[in-house]
From Swiss-Prot:
Heterodimer of an alpha subunit and a beta subunit processed from the same precursor. One of its GO terms (cellular component) is periplasmic space. Residues 1-26 form the signal peptide. The gene is quiP. This is Acyl-homoserine lactone acylase QuiP. It comes from Pseudomonas syringae pv. syringae (strain B728a).
Amino acid sequence: MASPALRHFLPRFGAAAAAASFLSLAGCQLGGNDPETVLPVSGTFPLKGLAQNVSVRRNNMGMPLIESSSYHDALFTLGYVHAGDRISQMLGMRLLAQGRLSEMAGADALDVDRLMRSVNLKQNASDLYNAASPRLKRFFDVYARGVNAYLFRYRDKLPADIASSGYKPEYWKPEDSALIFSLLNFSLSVNLQEELSALVLAQKVSADKLAWLLPTYPDEELPFAEADKLKGLNLNNQVTGLSDLNRIALQLSDLNMLGVAASSNWAIAPQRSRNGKSLLASDMQLPAGLNSAWSFVQIRAPKYQVSGVTIAGMPLVLSGFNGKLAWSMSNVKGDNQDLFLEKIKREGNRVSYMVDGKWLPAAAHQETFLVKGGSPLRETVYETRHGALLNASATPPGNGLSLALQVPNFKDDKSLDAFFDLSRAPNVEKAFDTSREIRAITLNMIFADASNIGWQVTGRFPNRREGQGLLPSPGWDGKYDWDGFADSMLHPYDQDPRQGWLAAANQRTIPKGYGMQLSNSWGYPERAERIAELANGGKQDLRSTIAMQYDQTTTFAAKLKSMFQAPGMSKPLKQAIDALPEADRNKAREAFTRLMAFDGKLSATSADAALYELFLQESAKQIFLDELGPETSPAWQALVANASSSYSPQADHLLGRDDSPYWDDVKTPQKEDKPAILARSLAAAITSGDSLLGSDHKAWQWGKLHRDNWASTSPLAKQLGGGEFNRGATPTGGDHTTLNVSGFEWGKGFDARMAPGLRMIVDFSLVEPMTGLISTGQSGNPASPYYANSIEPWQKGQYQSIPVQQQNYEKGYGKQRLTLTPGK
């Protein structure tokens, strides 16, 4: 998952920077690493709210083991420990979800707040919380009291990014955990950002050409009918606030809060396991940087034992192992959001919108923004039958077009209860029953017990009367409206398949022409193809599964070679290369020869991997830049952004689309074709490599172009010089198509923007089945020994065993412990 990389769309202290400052997963400590801001790892401390003593031990990663004689005390302690490790993350996510970042960050965050108020996650969270059982509400209440125990005890020792802002944190409410869940759900949705980007592209090219920029999958037809929805509409400067909306949506994507692109999970059935028991692997991916949003926890209490993955702010184990069942999640890339273009008429303060030829009054309510350093602002949010009119600027809707966002409602949703019940499920059969109740979030849930494996798609998917949801629909025409939701019993699932494995890597997981519309925003197919190659290649065990998670071989390279050698391409491409000027001709021939010999292994030290990626980058520019450029233009940024979230026109054109109009370079008098542009791209790859890596082509290395930047995303840390917050940059291999995912911006730069944030493997044949690893650190506080301490083990693949048997706790966690006692 992703979830989950800061691109530079604004100056350092613009809205993106302001948001990053307080969503930064690394707390900032002014004046040095103050140990007083860190939870102790040993000693005895009273804590009001506990009924009995609780023990907290830490392993080498910093993962806490919470041992308690009651589930109440375990949840209370989880809230306390989450806050101690990640309070900056928790408060930043809450403020973002509420649309209140400007209270801490000032006016620079106001546009983000405007968008988030109109999205109204607070209402979604309220619906989820109100629909939860009394039992679940009690759990959230106890957890909140644990968070508040931390906020009270450390009220004068909070991380400096909070303290220096002057912001006084409010106490945590039980509903706030539902709000964090709603933000996670929002972050998994790529549709808002993709539809905005598509609309930006529609302003640049005609509807006839637009479909070529919106491919959905290699074997799917281009969406010409979908693009026809926009024919006859004057989009240029007619959509209120579109440029601001797109800018803020891109920033949210960069903050890992919109359109988390990647995650992989798979399960191996006993017949394909070397030791005759199931295996489950989970690879949860996020934008690169400090720190991963994911963290580990282990809880041992009467009738509840679980180890797994959490997000601070929620008392739920989202992926994990309970001693009998292992479960994991990845992003379906489900399409459950739609933008609607609304015809707007403004008369004074009254706003109307058109429905089937009639003007209807838009509902309105006031929002107040308490901006740090400024006066309170009151602004009006308008709502149509589809949803709120999105706004990311001070410009109110006027006569023309505005955008409304429709999302499912969750008034009867039991997802929060279902996640808790899943963590207690004893087997795959029960996991199916509980996961079908998860409707608020679109996930590929894969689970395993010792003898069985299963896969279930969760979520709530709208039935559209017409349209595919790729582009905003005319809201004034009811034929594009939603007509209820797909029955959850129709959601795709599988159990114990004959092939002996199940896998989800953001690819299209359903056959072409499947009976319900799950999505048209699928990721690239190559990671899933590689899982299939390896899973079918022999018996699997823990060692081979670790190798799979670190695999850097792309199947796209072989497809590229097949395209070069295709009967209709081989000869024309040779002729196009021969027609180049001599210097370019020699470069193109060298690039072609080396790419044809390339084995697809994208290791950091590979010269041919560097050339391969240079070719991918240059081909995107040669194909599209003449019509969508310059590289700073909104259209080009939209193309790059969509390529980072789903299957792209860059890939689609390389492997096919020989008749696309984009093969012609409109800046030349002649008409180019695909072979001509490919020949230019081959030569340009060498030219670019010479500039970036030097003239000794054998000495090129992919890792010299492609790096993991272990840097805090907080501009406050940058303002202080980085220093204690950052951990430098390291060469890395892979790309967006490899299992060890390391995506870059296709058409922009080479730095890694997406990386696995946490890995988990459960091998049921082992005495202690669970192992795991986090990419950065358990803590977001640089003063903690568990801040960024996992980078080196991560790079070396040094997994940590996570014991579930009590007699093995000392080996996994040591003897040192923090004892929390009931306070008065």
